[in-house]
Amino acid sequence: MLKDLFVKRQYATVKSSTLKKSISEEKPNIPSGMWEKCDKCNSMIYAEDLENSKFVCATCGHHFRLNAKERIKVFFDKDTFKEFWKDLKTTNPLDFKGYEEKLKSTKTDSTEAVVTGVGKLNGIEVACAIMDSFFMMGSMGTVVGEKITRLIEHATENKLPLMIFTASGGARMQEGIFSLMQMAKISAALAKHSEAGLLYISILTDPTTGGVTASFAMEGDIILSEPNALIGFAGRRVIENTIKETLPDNFQKAEFLLEKGFVDAIVERKNMRACIYKILILHGVRN
């Protein structure tokens, strides 16, 4: 009897597999894509709320990057945008190894890093190019350059104002000199558009860098930017290693460029339509 008092009590045991199964069954079944995390403040945002706010965080004001399709939906009058030259396809002029595979692996609705066409803003017809950083980081190759050049020529012939939403990592290295040539080609077309007395508005979005910054992004009659957008040519580390100096924390941000006179205004996404409409009216553009 006394001996039984010192016998260790038997506790109930649960098999590991049973426990794991029980825990997994208790997890809520949340469909993927229902929530998005803000990169700046880490807030979790309901996807529908994010779309309704034009993909801007309600907590901190962070502007999410948009693909071309989202940008068109946010900016233009509903169902007014008509895309041009969608069937232009990239080739591999330098036989760069793995280039075709990289193009095929790019999972986006766009067929290239820019969408070009004509749309309406409060009834006013404008020619517009929307760069897509989700397609090979918005890099500029021959097709990107050709589509933008054709759009500028179309705007010149039809006396249309021009807008370009820039978002790019720069020239596409897989196309070498063919890619770099697009800078001069686009700039030449812009010069003719300007000589015709037509308006060109450049809207810089995050990120706008490299050869795009060195050419048409900074050639607008009016240059606007979304808040906190990364804008520059060479990377921060490259510059610091070259000049042997530490750069300011906000270097290559839209606010820094505004302070230095490289940007005319920083406009929040919710105000972009109204701002550009006002600019068009002030410049005598009508329906």
Curated annotation (Swiss-Prot):
GO terms for biological process: fatty acid biosynthetic process; malonyl-CoA biosynthetic process. It catalyses: N(6)-carboxybiotinyl-L-lysyl-[protein] + acetyl-CoA = N(6)-biotinyl-L-lysyl-[protein] + malonyl-CoA. It is found in: Cytoplasm. Pfam families: Carboxyl_trans, Zn_ribbon_ACC. A zinc finger (C4-type) spans 38-60. One of its GO terms (cellular component) is acetyl-CoA carboxylase complex. The keyword S-adenosyl-L-methionine does not apply. Pathway: Lipid metabolism; malonyl-CoA biosynthesis; malonyl-CoA from acetyl-CoA: step 1/1. Its EC number is 2.1.3.15. Its cofactor is Zn(2+). Residues 34-287 form the CoA carboxyltransferase N-terminal domain. Binds 1 zinc ion per subunit. Belongs to the AccD/PCCB family. Component of the acetyl coenzyme A carboxylase (ACC) complex. Biotin carboxylase (BC) catalyzes the carboxylation of biotin on its carrier protein (BCCP) and then the CO(2) group is transferred by the transcarboxylase to acetyl-CoA to form malonyl-CoA. Acetyl-CoA carboxylase is a heterohexamer composed of biotin carboxyl carrier protein (AccB), biotin carboxylase (AccC) and two subunits each of ACCase subunit alpha (AccA) and ACCase subunit beta (AccD). This is Acetyl-coenzyme A carboxylase carboxyl transferase subunit beta. It comes from Clostridium beijerinckii (strain ATCC 51743 / NCIMB 8052) (Clostridium acetobutylicum). The gene is accD.
